[in-house]
C-alpha cells in the first residue's frame, strides 16, 4: 500500500517541500520541527508506504495518535514540511520516493532535501552547501549558496530521494550543512534555515531561539540521535569522496 491521505485540505500553489528525515546531527529533523512549530503549520496529510515502520506516535501535549511520517502545510507561504518521527532506512526510502513522486507531480511540488556532513566543531559557524537537479541547480545558484567544492555523495534516505530525482529528471534541491555527528546540532539546523531555506523559499523564519534552546533540544532529541548513530549507513548524510576508494 502506498498513499498520501489528506487530513485537512490546504490550498497551496507550486509549493516547496522541506524534507525532515532524521539523519546525522538530526539537522533536517530539528529544522523541520522548528518550521512546523514556529510557523504554526497545519497537519495536512499522512504518508503511508509499505517500507515505513508500522508504529503510531504520540506527543506529550495531545492524546491523539498519529502515523510517524506526516506532511504539514502553510497556505500563505506555499510551504510544505515532511516530518518524520522515526528513522527511515534506504529500502523504505526507495518505496517512499516512488510513493511521493506522483503526488509531487500532481501538486507541482519542489522538494528541498536536507543532510549533514560530519565535521569537528570549531569557533566559526558551520558551512552550508547546495546541490540540485533540473531547475534546482539554478535555484541554488540564485540563492547564493555555494557548491561543496569537492566530490562527494549523499547516502541514507535523503540520498535515495535525491537519486530518484536524478533518475526521473525531476527538479530537486539538496542542502548540506557541516554538523557535529555526536549530538543533535541546533546550530547547524539554524544555518540550514537562515542561509538555505529562507533564501530558497522567501519565507522568513525566526531562528534565534534554536541556539537559546540548544540544551533543551539536545535532551529532547537524544534518544532518536542514539538510534540514528546505531543505524550507521542508514542515516542521511553527505561525505566527501577521496581519490582512492
Feature names for model-found ranges:
Residues 1-107, 167:
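N-terminal catalytic or cofactor-binding beta/alpha core of small enzyme domains
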Residues 19, 82-83, 113-115, 176:
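Short beta-strand segments
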Residues 21-26, 88, 116-120, 181-183:
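Gly/Ser/Thr-rich loops at beta-strand to alpha-helix junctions
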Residues 26-30, 91, 95, 99, ...:
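Conserved active-site and cofactor/substrate-binding residues in soluble primary-metabolism enzymes
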Residues 43-47, 113-114, 174:
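General beta-strand structural signal in soluble alpha/beta enzymes
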Residues 87-137:
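Internal, conserved structured core segments that host functional sites
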Residues 120-196:
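Catalytic cores of processing enzymes, dominated by hydrolases/peptidases
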Residues 176-245:
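Extended, histidine- and acidic-residue-enriched regions that form the cofactor-binding/catalytic faces
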Amino acid at each position: 500500500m502506498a498513499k498520501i491521505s489528506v487530513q485537512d485540505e490546504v490550498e497551496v500553489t507550486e509549493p516547496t517541500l522541506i524534507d525532515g528525515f532524521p539523519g546525522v546531527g538530526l539537522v533536517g529533523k530539528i529544522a523541520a520541527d522548528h518550521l512546523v512549530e514556529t510557523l504554526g503549520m497545519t497537519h495536512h496529510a499522512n504518508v503511508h508506504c509499505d517500507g515505513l515502520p508500522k508504529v503510531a506516535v504520540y506527543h506529550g501535549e495531545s492524546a491523539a495518535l498519529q502515523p510517524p511520517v506526516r506532511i504539514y502545510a502553510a497556505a500563505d507561504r506555499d510551504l510544505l514540511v515532511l516530518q518524520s518521527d522515526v528513522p527511515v532506512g534506504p529500502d523504505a526510502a526507495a518505496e517512499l520516493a516512488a510513493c511521493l513522486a506522483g503526488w509531487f507531480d500532481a501538486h507541482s511540488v519542489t522538494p528541498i532535501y536536507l543532510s549533514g556532513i560530519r565535521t569537528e566543531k570549531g569557533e566559526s559557524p558551520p558551512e552550508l552547501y547546495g546541490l540540485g537537479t533540473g531547475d534546482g541547480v539554478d535555484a541554488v545558484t540564485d540563492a547564493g549558496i555555494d557548491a561543496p567544492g569537492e566530490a562527494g555523495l549523499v547516502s541514507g534516505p535523503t540520498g535515495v530521494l535525491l537519486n530518484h530525482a536524478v533518475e526521473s529528471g525531476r527538479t530537486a534541491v539538496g542542502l548540506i550543512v557541516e554538523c557535529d555527528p555526536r549530538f543533535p546540532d541546533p546550530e547547524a539546523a539554524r544555518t540550514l534555515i537562515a542561509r538555505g531555506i529562507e533564501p530558497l523559499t522567501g519565507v522568513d523564519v525566526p531562528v534565534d531561539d534554536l541556539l537559546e534552546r540548544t540544551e533543551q533540544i539536545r535532551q529532547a532529541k537524544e534518544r532518536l540521535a542514539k538510534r540514528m548513530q546505531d543505524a550507521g549507513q542508514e542515516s542521511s548524510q553527505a561525505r566527501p569522496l577521496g581519490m582512492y576508494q
